[in-house]
């Protein structure tokens, strides 16, 4: 029991540290990718090739003056960024980061917890994320902050519905709500992307909107809202909001890789590697390779596509993605009936 508890604590700390490190260097990668796409050099002053730029940015944020507007709600003003940063860490506990490690006759799963309602937990926690933005925008007592927060809330709530419906079709196919079981079912080339291509397309578009990334970055639209919901924030509170975006991007990429691209499963590797622990380690490395690829896709889309107008954003969510998600559920049900999986 004590060993199990220690292992779980190690897993929590490891996932927390990896998310922090990935979030830090996602900022560096974003600036380098943007520079490449715009034929620039990018960060190259802090350390060799600029690899210490995230550290420099963190020190800069930490050293800036901490300012709280006089007419703001101080308690909620502090709670907003803390909540925004806490939510993505809470979602990471149900993601399977690998298979089982066999140590001294015991099996240790590379997952903090594999609850049988993992998908429901994931969506329940993600839906709370809107409070971090709404509280911060409202507590700032600034019209631009409030408008940005209202935009973010309506956008996230709208796209959560289409995202949820896309997952319903996947749950129908896999017959489980456990993310651990979903990953285990995708051994070999039995990836869910081949069975749910439309669901994946809907899910990834909604993921862009949920993380407030371009072309869905209307809550932070500088040309209209100054800085959006974090206009009045400075120092580490602003850093929390900006950092939360990159950790959300990391978690979203991990969820996409797990639900649709086999997670830690690596096709054909079992023919060449027979040690179960090495298979687990290589599978985890393969999962992180997929995550890095999807983080690159997030950044590539941001620096390639222009921002939507707000009416276009709402039309896409309600008039296109929602009917497509419902049609996907109907098509999945019909195919399952025709193949004899349901009666």
What are these regions (language model features)?
Residues 1-343:
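Selective transmembrane helix interface/packing segments
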């Amino acid at each position: 029991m004590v060993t199990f508890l220690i292992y779980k604590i190690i897993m929590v700390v490891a996932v927390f540290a990896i998310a922090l490190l990935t979030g830090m260097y996602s900022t560096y990668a974003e600036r380098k990718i943007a520079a490449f796409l715009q034929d620039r050099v990018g960060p190259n002053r802090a350390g060799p090739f600029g690899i210490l730029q995230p550290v420099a940015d963190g020190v800069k944020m930490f050293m800036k003056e901490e300012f709280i507007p006089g007419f703001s709600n101080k308690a909620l003003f502090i709670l907003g960024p803390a909540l925004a940063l806490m939510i993505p860490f809470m979602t990471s506990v149900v993601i399977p980061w690998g298979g089982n490690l066999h140590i001294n006759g015991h099996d240790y799963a590379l997952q903090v917890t594999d609850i049988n309602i993992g998908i429901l937990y994931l969506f329940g926690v993600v839906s709370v994320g809107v409070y971090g933005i709404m509280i911060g925008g409202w507590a700032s007592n600034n019209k631009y902050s409030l408008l940005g927060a209202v935009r973010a809330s309506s956008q996230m709530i709208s796209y959560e519905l289409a995202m949820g419906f896309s997952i319903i079709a996947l749950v129908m196919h896999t017959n489980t709500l456990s993310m651990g079981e979903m990953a285990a079912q995708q051994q070999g080339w039995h990836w869910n992307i081949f069975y749910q291509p439309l669901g994946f397309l809907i899910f990834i578009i909604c993921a862009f909107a949920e993380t407030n990334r371009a072309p869905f970055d209307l809550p932070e639209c500088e040309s209209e809202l100054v800085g959006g919901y974090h206009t009045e924030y400075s120092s580490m509170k602003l850093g929390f909001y900006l950092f939360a975006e990159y950790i959300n991007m990391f978690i979203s990429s991990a969820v996409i890789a797990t639900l649709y691209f086999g997670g830690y499963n690596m096709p054909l590797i079992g023919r060449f590697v027979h040690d179960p622990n090495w298979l687990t380690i290589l599978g985890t490395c393969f999962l992180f390779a997929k995550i890095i690829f999807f983080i690159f896709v997030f950044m590539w889309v941001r620096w390639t596509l222009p921002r939507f107008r707000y009416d276009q954003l709402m039309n896409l969510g309600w008039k296109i993605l929602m009917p497509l998600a419902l049609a996907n559920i109907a098509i999945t049900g019909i195919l399952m009936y025709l193949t004899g999986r349901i009666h």
